[in-house]
Amino acid sequence: MRLSLLATLPIALIACSGNAPATEGSPQAGETPPSAKPFRETIVTDFVSPWALAFLPDERIVVTEKAGQMILLSPDGKRRQTIATLSVDTAGQGGLMDVVPAPDFATSKRIYFSYSTKGAGGKGVVLARGRLRDDGRGGDRLSEIEALFQARPFVEGDGHYSGRIAFAPDGQSLFFTNGERQKFTPAQDPQATLGKVLRLTLDGKPAPGNPLAAKGFAPEVWSYGHRNLLGIAFDGEGRLWEQEMGPKGGDEVNLIMPGRNYGWPNASNGRHYDGRDIPDHAPGDGYEPPKVWWNPVISPGGLMIYTGKMFPQWQGDAFIGGLSSQSLVRVDLDGQNARKGDQWPMGARIRDVDQGPDGAIWLIEDGGKSQGRLIRLTAK
């Protein structure tokens, strides 16, 4: 049975034509000076508090804005159309979030997305999809909207929704991140989907073969013990990587393995904001340690694993948008191992990162007009 439309779908859909950015600071130790950036930056256009971007097979770009707008952009950025205006809960870290075209978009025209909403018990994140259709006026609109899955339980508060989406390499299932909503303990609660990586069918049901269902966990759970998971992506060998914000210190990049416990809130390489200690990850503690972590934090936003030809030296590496660090971060991935690479200061909070069809790297800033720019990085 579909989820109740009244409880989970945006109540306003009009098909038609965050956070404030931090002030720029000095580069942190270890950052690459601006003069050493190995790419050119081209400002394509700007948005109002954008959250995610994704490329369609025809090279057009879909961008979500926090307030609920989903925008379709021509590759050169000169033509834009709002294909949906969704009623979402925008308080705090909420709003319209991730967007990813379906693996079979060329035939199905489906676009998957996530958003926060109010419901029984509080608020939560929802996975939904729609179909891109001709609007009869020379443009497009998102139609046939349906909610597929909602986090359990809904709780009070406006933070740590997560809501990132990644399709499995075979295109038969998807992975969806649920943050622990700043409540700590749900990350270790087997019945909650909060603080988890979930594996779902394309219709939002628990995917067959999930590793913890027989152990009393919610049937959607793939891994648990997570905090605020704002990036998830597969590498070329089918390994699933995830990055998440730590507390005061301890931002992480994790290799996601089925059934593993990643420790939060019982283990972290950071501390609580009030200064209380959290046990560090340690051998034999029963928790899967991060492959890379940061102290001080970078505040990781979106995650992309590079496969293009424009920057051949970076093939297979992970790229992370830094929010409080106002940077683009590269992580060198080598099989199941990872190590820190470059960190380039960008002068603004970077919310999301994606790869264009020609191998260019695209970024969106986290902020309002002229501080929510879409930027294309090309080789020098």
Question: Where is each model-derived feature located?
Answer:
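Beta-propeller blade signature
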Residues: 125-135, 190-203, 256-257
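Aromatic-anchored helix/helix-loop segment that forms the rim or "lid"
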Residues: 282-297, 301
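Short, conserved, GDST-rich strand-edge loop motifs in beta-rich repeat architectures
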Residues: 117, 176-194, 250-256
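Bacterial N-terminal signal peptides
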Residues: 4-15
